[in-house]
């Protein structure tokens, strides 16, 4: 299951840059990769002016490309009243002062975990299918885990390698591939070793 994400996602970014055809190609590509019914166009409601344009375009793309919509909320804190605390934490994280008008901040106070009733009030009249699809995803993702038990993935290692040697080898190969050289500069090797 995959979605087109918030305004920071690739498809919304293409829409905001005016490249609707590029956004449609990307959406089609993700749908092909994930399989029919597993890729969703994601509409949201927030204080960012560009969101309305992106939502309108995503609804049109949904019809044109036969891709399902979901309604989500970009949640960064639990309650709407936590917006001020979130803003303060952003200041701590970025080393900014709350009084600095030019600092990084979220627009509005609607990045909280909205209730189902709030989501229905926002999307229920115009895009009820987006909420139904969101619930379908939740139903598909439902999992029950036994408390007190660790669930770790199985990760088979090549013969003769430990986790440490395997990770080191894969990281070194990735560095060489990314830099397109068999002999990365010493400062890169030192940073890789540090990491």
Where are the regions that the model predicts?
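Phosphodiester-processing cores and adjacent nucleic acid-binding clamps
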Residues: 1-195
């Amino acid at each position: 299951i995959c979605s087109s994400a918030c305004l920071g996602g690739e498809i919304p970014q293409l829409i905001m840059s005016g490249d609707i055809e590029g956004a449609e190609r990307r959406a089609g590509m993700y749908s092909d990769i994930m399989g029919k019914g597993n890729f969703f166009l994601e509409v949201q409601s927030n204080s960012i002016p560009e969101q309305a344009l992106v939502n309108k375009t995503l609804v049109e793309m949904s019809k044109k490309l036969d891709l399902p919509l979901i309604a989500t909320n970009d949640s960064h804190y639990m309650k709407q009243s936590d917006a001020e605390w979130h803003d303060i934490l952003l200041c701590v994280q970025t080393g900014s002062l709350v009084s600095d008008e030019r600092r990084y901040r979220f627009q509005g106070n609607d990045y909280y975990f909205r209730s189902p009733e709030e989501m229905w009030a926002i999307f229920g009249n115009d895009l009820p299918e987006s909420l139904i699809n969101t619930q379908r995803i939740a139903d598909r993702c439902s999992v029950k885990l036994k408390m007190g038990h660790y669930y770790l993935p199985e990760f088979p290692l090549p013969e003769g390698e430990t986790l440490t040697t395997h990770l080191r080898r894969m990281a070194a190969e990735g560095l060489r591939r990314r830099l397109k050289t068999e002999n990365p500069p010493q400062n890169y090797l030192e940073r890789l070793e540090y990491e």
